[in-house]
Amino acid sequence: MAAERQDALREFVAVTGAEEDRARFFLESAGWDLQIALASFYEDGGDEDIVTISQATPSSVSRGTAPSDNRVTSFRDLIHDQDEDEEEEEGQRFYAGGSERSGQQIVGPPRKRSPNELVDDLFKGAKEHGAVAVERVTKSPGETSKPRPFAGGGYRLGAAPEEESAYVAGERRRHSGQDVHVVLKLWKTGFSLDNGELRSYQDPSNAQFLESIRRGEVPAELRRLAHGGQVNLDMEDHRDEDFVKPKGAFKAFTGEGQKLGSTAPQILNTSSPAQQAENEAKASSSISIDESQPTTNIQIRLADGGRLVQKFNHSHRISDIRLFIVDARPAMAATSFVLMTTFPNKELADENQTLKEANLLNAVIVQRLT
């Protein structure tokens, strides 16, 4: 085992030209797997300071002298140029040891493209497929972002003078989906859609999206948003700027509270309709009615805009009406209010009076907050 590790160490040093301590570090990190260690070494940029030895041109191949400005390009030259482009995308190739007739070739990781190159490629691909560069124009407040086509009726002109013009009614535009307008912003380290979050250029999950843009196609995730409608995509170049998270839209308070600004603030009901109906039923059942005694119906107009109608005996007191209101609207238990008649408008100050004594039989009572 030790001999195999020593052989791997010597071969690593021979291939990379690295120091023995550094070679041992990469081999130990790779579990003494020579291939993985070499790939890790070159991916880490360990070959930056190593001088590569150029291969000598075979002497057996004779070439005639040709002028330096030779304008004839052979098919072999085209293949050679294509191979060079593929090698730039694929990564550098390395030869790992072996004998005269055997050996192993290791392909390094692909060359990472800078964000500037990536953005240039996206704009270039979009222009090749019909995209048009436009200047950013500031819109007036009343200006729409997109002109609407004429959709009214009109007269169809005849082809000959003797033909009469016929009125043609306009057809309504049929929408199979909804039109979507999206702004793609290309930043220094990533891109964003409209006011969304930053998405990295290097994230594999974004590769298909960017490739669709480069081919001049609308990405699938944007087509799904339109549900069959038209997708208008604008691209903005911000490659020299760092991503700035947009400010969140203002969201108004949606809770409940009291209306201020008057001597008698309006109490906003916080109960749901079902809870309110349950409270009113409990309040009605809490009033004990003696059917053998005379009864009357009292209508109560509440300060929150509600209305209650309850049966009482003539012997019930005004204080019983107050308790009924509090049971029907528990939120008013801690609220100061008075009860008043409508015509004439008079406060019922003595709540110990019976309904008959206060002349409130079949009357309308109004609740007023104090």
From Swiss-Prot:
GO biological process: autophagosome assembly; establishment of mitotic spindle orientation; Golgi organization; membrane fusion; negative regulation of protein localization to centrosome; nuclear membrane reassembly; positive regulation of mitotic centrosome separation; proteasome-mediated ubiquitin-dependent protein catabolic process
Motif mapping: Nuclear localization signal: 109-115, 172-175
Identification of the protein by name: NSFL1 cofactor p47
Residue(s) carrying Phosphotyrosine: Y167
Subunit structure: Part of a ternary complex containing STX5A, NSFL1C and VCP. NSFL1C forms a homotrimer that binds to one end of a VCP homohexamer. The complex binds to membranes enriched in phosphatidylethanolamine-containing lipids and promotes Golgi membrane fusion. Interaction with VCIP135 leads to dissociation of the complex via ATP hydrolysis by VCP. Binds ubiquitin and mono-ubiquitinated proteins via its N-terminal UBA-like domain when bound to VCP.
SMART domains xref list: SEP, UBX
Region (Disordered): 54-73, 80-116, 137-157, 272-292
InterPro entries on file: NSFL1C_SEP_dom_sf, SEP_domain, UBA-like_sf, Ubiquitin-like_domsf, UBX_dom
